[in-house]
A protein has these predicted regions:
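N-terminal targeting segments with Sec-dependent signals, encompassing both cleavable signal peptides
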Residues: 1-211
Length: 212
């Protein structure tokens, strides 16, 4: 029992350290070639007169920005200049979440969700609910998030781990190579797969997987 409790603690730490910060920010097709502005021109306009940028350029500016302050400025500009577009709220929420402001992130994700209830806004709200311990609500959001990629499987696996459904967690994690996947395999008693998973990832953190 003590070992199980320690393993659960490791799973929660992995949730905080790895899954939650990696929110599904909305992806854009780069349209710079079409609109004729270089990255430098877009970032310069963001700094000096963001109102001249299209919504795609504004969100793109956040994607290419090198620092978080500029990213936040881009998404704030998107919300101000294009208040009906969900992407600014979504990405601004992601920045708040990564900064540890879960409440602020949830408010922005809710606004994004009202603008457009799509798989990504559902997924992000699911992550917030998972972080807040509202597992049933998180599962409802995840159920409407099909199409966001492997992160959905990871999030569902962590949810199953929290519920003690280790076999279900291992079954849904698929071929994902991450510290979280390693935890799932350890808790399911599959140490060989856990080891191969750790070996395959770029930045393995074995400490997360050796708490028992």
């Amino acid at each position: 029992r003590e070992k199980e409790i320690k393993n659960m603690s490791a799973a929660y730490k992995a949730l905080a350290d790895e899954i939650l910060p990696q929110l599904r920010c909305s992806k854009l097709q780069v349209v710079v070639d079409v609109i004729g502005r270089s990255d430098e021109e877009i970032l310069d306009l963001l700094k000096n007169d963001a109102s001249k940028l299209s919504v795609e350029e504004t969100i793109y500016a956040g994607a290419i920005a090198k620092d978080d302050d500029t990213k936040v400025k881009a998404y704030e500009a998107a919300m101000k200049n294009y208040p009906e577009d969900w992407r600014g709220y979504n990405n601004a929420g992601a920045m708040k979440f990564m900064a540890g402001d879960v409440k602020g992130a949830q408010e922005l994700f809710n606004q994004a969700f009202v603008k457009q209830a799509n798989p990504e806004t559902n997924f992000n709200l699911g992550l917030v609910e998972l972080a807040n311990g509202n597992d049933a609500t998180a599962e409802e959001y995840f159920g409407r998030a099909a199409g966001v990629g492997d992160k959905l499987n990871e999030a569902m696996a962590v949810l199953y781990v929290k519920q003690g459904k280790y076999k279900d967690a291992a079954g849904i994690i698929g071929n994902v190579k991450s510290n979280n996947a390693g935890i799932v395999y350890i808790m399911n008693g599959d140490l060989n797969t856990a080891q191969s998973t750790l070996t395959a990832i770029e930045n393995p953190d074995a400490n997360k997987l050796r708490s028992g």
